[in-house]
Amino acid sequence: MLLLLLLLLLGPGSCLSEATRRSHVYKRGLLELAGTLDCVGPRSPMAYMNYGCYCGLGGHGEPRDAIDWCCYYHDCCYSQAQDAGCSPKLYRYPWKCMDHRILCGPAENKCQELLCRCDETLAYCLADTEYHLKYLFFPSVLCEKDSPKCN
């Protein structure tokens, strides 16, 4: 049973066909962040739902590995967007997936541009990482209280 769960989490994990991933126009809210990850990444977006100290909702402590650092920087990017008056978890923006590349826009405003760049950066960052099963479902109680400062 655990093996089946891991295969679902780490496999292609998408209901989108290859043709759809290559040339589909998306608009996103928080739930559609998975689409940008699916466009670029070698893993299912579900593989990051509860990984390390930062992948998933919230986050604190020292990031555990390169994947966790990607999620940490994404949290920082969302914080900066929020400071600029955007609502990262609710705001929608247009983008395309073409040949496993994210194409942001055309943006109607600065928030759309900022949020697409946050998600694009995360997707490319995660695509270049090695996955460590030991950080999947990592207990948050093992994450330190203090977090690094966002730049």
Curated annotation (Swiss-Prot):
Q: Which family does it belong to?
A: Belongs to the phospholipase A2 family.
Q: Which residues form a coiled coil?
A: none
* Protein name per UniProt: Group 10 secretory phospholipase A2
As its record notes, the protein acts as a catalyst of: a 1,2-diacyl-sn-glycero-3-phosphocholine + H2O = a 1-acyl-sn-glycero-3-phosphocholine + a fatty acid + H(+); 1-hexadecanoyl-2-(9Z-octadecenoyl)-sn-glycero-3-phosphocholine + H2O = 1-hexadecanoyl-sn-glycero-3-phosphocholine + (9Z)-octadecenoate + H(+); 1-octadecanoyl-2-(5Z,8Z,11Z,14Z-eicosatetraenoyl)-sn-glycero-3-phosphocholine + H2O = 1-octadecanoyl-sn-glycero-3-phosphocholine + (5Z,8Z,11Z,14Z)-eicosatetraenoate + H(+); 1,2-dihexadecanoyl-sn-glycero-3-phosphocholine + H2O = 1-hexadecanoyl-sn-glycero-3-phosphocholine + hexadecanoate + H(+)
- Look up keyword Hydrolase and say if it applies: yes
This protein's GO CC annotations: acrosomal vesicle; extracellular region; extracellular space; lysosome
Report the gene name.
Pla2g10
What does this protein need as cofactor?
Ca(2+)
Q: Which PANTHER family match?
A: GROUP 10 SECRETORY PHOSPHOLIPASE A2, PHOSPHOLIPASE A2 FAMILY MEMBER
Lineage of the species this protein comes from: Eukaryota, Metazoa, Chordata, Craniata, Vertebrata
